Amino acid sequence: VGSEMCIRDSYEFETISLPVLSEVGGDIQFIANTDDTAIGGMTMNTGVKQIDMNSLTRVDGTVFLTAFAELRTLPALNGVTVKGIELVNLGKLLDPLDFSGTTFSGGGRLLLTNMNLIETLTMPAQADVTLELRYNKLLNEVDGAEELAGLVYSPGTDCTFPTLRIVRGDVSFGLGQQVGVSTPSLERVEGNLLNDVKTIAYPKLTEVGGYLAVTDNVSNDSGSCDFRSLHKVGGQLYFDSTNIYAAIDMPELEEVGTAANPAYYKEGANDQYYKDAVYGSCALLSYDGLNFPKLRKVGGRGFTLDLGLGMANFTDLNLFALEEVEGIFQIHQNGPDMQPTAPLETIELPVIQKIGSVHIEGCGKLTDFSAFLPVIGQLNADTWFVHEDCGYSPTYEDMKAGHASKQ
């Protein structure tokens, strides 16, 4: 077939057989939408039980199979060269699903949506395809794949990707307040990495090329985040640990926001309470502290720390290796005159060499700003600001005169 092939409204058939079809220059579409049975707003075909394409070797486009309620086995796609495969509302397709012999030619996606009986998906080690898994009730393991073009996961259930090492594009684990994701072998994400699930585990992850975002869907279990090996985030590190009553722990992290054009999950004004609050390239909300003992450089728009509503146990900010912040260094509590005041008492930056600007608010117990004396000569009255609601609010002239702490 020189271009695409489309078969719709085939409700009168039990079998669709194309025994000599070998190559298709575009897409193959089997789309059923005529029967009265509906799932998720889509009408289902309850007649077709079998689709045969046993001679198929190559599809230059995507194979679409949509809304066949009684289809139990796939056409012979394991071994085909194809751009993409999209399987939607095939509620009786039997487990397991094996694409280990399929060659994905690039630029497409492997989409599974509402596949109610599939528990295990097996893929080739090198798969030039974006894998999208959406609302599959039982799917709990994706095996075989070592490298993907991209990955999107919407629960579903808990899922593990035991062999996955590299994703060349974006990864999104989304809308999963009750589920966990495990990627025990993942080493590198070249695009963005979004975490919006209950638990996440990246024990071998060393680098994220774009932004790394962790939302407040993450569990209050202190072990719900594992970034023990992470060295570099090229874009924004956005971490909302509202529900994590433990320090943000990244013991090997050295640099954030240092890509040539850093990607941001959130940017611009974070001004719900303070009109001058912003999202930096290292934008953190933490109740219980930071463990960044090796962080050397923050590029892009700078380092911003939100201390929440004053409910934190965060008393000491120690960034012992931090040398450079290209943009702003900002700390704020979520709202002026909030009670109790943020408990932050000390800031330690023993090797700091460069900061673009300083802006600190809402820290009623903070009375010593000596950490900034090594860089005060780089600043001026416009780039130095400490709000009067802090325990001590030295002006730029105070700092220039060496009056960095409350007497």
Question: Where do the protein language model's features map onto the residues?
Answer:
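Sequence contexts marking disulfide-bonded cysteines in secreted/extracellular proteins
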Residues: 7, 158-160, 224-226, 281-283, ...
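Leucine-rich solenoid repeat scaffolds
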Residues: 348-407
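Short, T/G/N/S-enriched strand-turn elements that build extracellular solenoid repeat scaffolds
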Residues: 13-22, 47-57, 70-80, 93-104, ...
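Intrinsically disordered, low-complexity segments enriched in Gly and acidic/Ser/Thr residues
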Residues: 325-349
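Acidic/polar low-complexity surface segments
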Residues: 31-43, 257-279, 333-339
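Feature marks extracellular polysaccharide-active and adherence modules
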Residues: 8, 19, 31-33, 54, ...
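Short, small-residue-biased leader/transition segments that mark boundaries at the very start
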Residues: 1-7
